[in-house]
Amino acid sequence: MKKMELLAPAGNPEKLKLAFLYGADAAYLGGTSFSLRAFSDNFTPEQIKEAVEYAHSLGKKIYVTVNIFPSDEDFQYLPDYLRYLESIDVDAVLIADPGIFRLCREVAPNLSIHVSTQANTTNWSAVRFWKECGAERVVLAREVPLRDVKDIYEKTHMELEGFVHGAMCISYSGRCLLSNYFTQDRDSNHGECVQCCRFKYSLVEEKRPGEYFPVMEDERGTYIMNSKDMCLIGHFQA
């Protein structure tokens, strides 16, 4: 049986070392730009290079997130950044936006691409599409049921990655506008979500002003907003 890769996030160099110390085979991290890991300390270009060298000395891997949904102005700086990541032998980049994917293939053709969970890949046909585009791995959307993962693999024979711990967004993998609405400048699609779905809410119907329906939660979660944490550790053997 093929060995599964254990991948952990690294918000800064110290956490990177801890991830490897406790058994991670690879770590993913964000740079100071173009990453949805906005509230991590993140890594400067030089720190990314040092992280790659450190990981490779241990026989481990580094993946860098380049998974924002960019505006046109971002494309002024992305080519040089992607070329730099290729030059320092980053093991792969995580990309969600087709425009960045296309650019990466053009300016850094030797850089492996993993399709980020932010791309909301939920089915075998989409996985096959990314495979045909040249992706080496697809990180499935968190909404994909565990029972579907085997079927997706059998129909694509694509390298797949899935989250086994962490928050479940109420929207498809971060496509939420609540954070923008309530804060005006904290964009969930740029890694700045304040998780407004975890606030306490009441529901009001327009024709019944002053009558508040509390958004309650039971063992199955809430029925209006359903943010929860996932935990699949019971499905894995040591």
Model-predicted regions and their roles:
Residues 112, 134, 138-140:
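Acidic, glycine-enriched active-site microenvironments
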Residues 1-121, 148-238:
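Active-site pocket-lining/capping segments in soluble small-molecule metabolic enzymes
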Residues 143:
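Active-site loop and adjoining helix of the penicillin-binding protein/serine DD-peptidase-beta-lactamase fold
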Residues 124-125:
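Conserved nucleotide-cofactor-binding alpha/beta core module
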